[in-house]
A protein has these predicted regions:
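Glycine-rich beta-strand-centered segment in the early N-terminal region that forms part
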Residues: 31-45, 60-121, 138
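Cytochrome P450 core scaffold surrounding the K-helix E-X-X-R motif
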Residues: 50-55, 126
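Eukaryotic N-terminal low-complexity, Ser/Thr- and Lys/Arg-rich leader segments
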Residues: 1-12
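Residue-level recognition of beta-strand termini and adjacent short loop/turns
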Residues: 18-20, 34
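Short N-terminal binding/cap micro-motifs at the start of the first secondary-structure element
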Residues: 20-25, 49-51
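NAD(P)H dinucleotide-binding glycine-rich loop of Rossmann-like/cofactor-binding domains
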Residues: 75-86, 118-173
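Conserved hydrophobic/aromatic beta-strand scaffold that supports enzyme active sites
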Residues: 24, 39, 96-98, 144-146, ...
Length: 173
């Protein structure tokens, strides 16, 4: 693992522990990155309507359910930020953060890099939707967040997934 300055062992985090039940955890563990994982310090996080839906629905939200395919149960068990079903999660999927540690197999990102997160994990379907950062994988309402290297993009936005406009929009649209 490659890391920057001292990383604390615990942090403050907002955790969703049940329907309409948010708690501030002043001693949530700061996870160390595995081989293909990144640990980043959160610089900014936004909340939106989908966070409110998760707050109300909790385990019944389609993106809070278990991954059906794309990763083996063994790999999922090795990811401490994978929290499907009734496990508490950390909401917050709109985030800018700075990488503070990387796993030894991470090749496309470096410590100190500022990144955005691609929320939707389309290659990890659940029973009713797709897995997502801030749902069945912990989000960014915490000081440090652990992520797979494939879900971050550099903050310039040049590699972010923005759908192309294929038709000219009518005037006044």
């Amino acid at each position: 693992m490659t890391a920057s300055a001292t990383i604390p062992k615990t942090q403050y985090a907002v955790q969703l522990v049940g329907p309409s039940e948010l708690r501030v955890n002043p001693e949530k563990e700061v996870f160390q990155p595995g081989p293909h994982q990144i640990l980043a310090k959160v610089e900014a996080v936004g909340l939106c309507f989908s966070d409110l839906k998760l707050l109300k629905q909790f385990k019944d939200h389609a993106r809070k359910s278990e991954v059906m395919k794309g990763l083996s149960a063994e790999i999922l068990a090795s990811i401490p930020s994978y929290v499907p079903g009734e496990k508490p999660t950390v909401p917050g999927h709109e985030v800018v953060c700075r990488i503070v540690a990387i796993g030894d197999q991470v090749k496309q990102h470096t410590v100190g890099e500022r990144v955005l997160v691609q929320t939707d994990y389309r290659n990890l379907p659940t029973a009713g939707s797709n897995s997502a950062f801030g749902y069945n994988f912990e989000g960014a309402l915490q000081e440090y967040v652990l992520m797979d290297e494939r879900v971050v993009v550099d903050a310039s936005g040049e590699r972010f997934l923005i759908p192309p406009i294929v038709e000219r929009l009518p005037d006044g649209a």
